[in-house]
Amino acid sequence: MSLIGKLFGTGGKGAKGPSPQEAIQKLRDTEEMLTKKQEFLEKKIEQELVTAKKHGTKNKRAALQALKRKKRYEKQLAQIDGTLSTIEFQREALENANTNTEVLKNMGFAAKAMKAAHDNMDIEKVDELMQDIADQQELAQEISDAISKPVGFGEDFDEDELMAELEELEQEELDKNLLEVQGPETVPLPNVPAAVLPAKPVKKKQEEDDDDMRELENWATA
């Protein structure tokens, strides 16, 4: 039996090792125990420091003993710090290994499931099925085109004649609109001789002024 086996009570060829989850839990428990030990030592160090300051020069022997205990506690604390770092590293490595194991296990399970799903599949049958689907889609499209195509029912007209008639109607409508824009046709008036009319006799300015004065006098004496 190995030294590690003697320490942890394990050994023998038939002994089964702990599972990753069990080992991780053990490491966490150990971390918790060492953390509590750290807190205890930190308190003891503070107490011994207070004791050393308390005695000081009054009782050098007691002060020196307190400082010695403080040094021992500090040494133990440093050892625990190193042990905790090692345990944390081991736990993280074990957790990563356990995660990788679970991932690979699930990937293998998925691969088996995919293989089982493909066991009853034949690539040739898949190709035939896809070809059948394409043929049926093409047939459905042809049927839809045939249904949507208008049927004559005796209305077989010459497209050229219909277009010519339509153009004639459009031209008539265009001519009508042009006539409405131009307005009614103007009728020429008969010629009138260009004779000069006699001008109205113009009174002289003095005569007009005399007439105005007479009218004003008549109005004033009336």
From Swiss-Prot:
Keywords: Coiled coil, Cytoplasm, Endosome, Membrane, Protein transport, Transport. GO terms for biological process: exit from mitosis; membrane fission; mitotic cytokinesis; nuclear membrane reassembly; protein transport; vacuolar transport. It comes from the Eukaryota. Residues 1-21, 183-222 are annotated as: Disordered. It is found in: Cytoplasm, Cytosol; Late endosome membrane; Midbody. Residues 188-200 have a biased composition (Low complexity). Residues 21-182 form a coiled coil. One of its GO terms (cellular component) is midbody. InterPro entries: Snf7_fam. It is a peripheral membrane protein. Its main location: cytoplasm. It holds the Pfam family Snf7. Probable core component of the endosomal sorting required for transport complex III (ESCRT-III) which is involved in multivesicular bodies (MVBs) formation and sorting of endosomal cargo proteins into MVBs. MVBs contain intraluminal vesicles (ILVs) that are generated by invagination and scission from the limiting membrane of the endosome and mostly are delivered to lysosomes enabling degradation of membrane proteins, such as stimulated growth factor receptors, lysosomal enzymes and lipids. Probable core component of the endosomal sorting required for transport complex III (ESCRT-III). ESCRT-III components are thought to multimerize to form a flat lattice on the perimeter membrane of the endosome. Belongs to the SNF7 family. This is Charged multivesicular body protein 4b. It comes from Xenopus tropicalis.
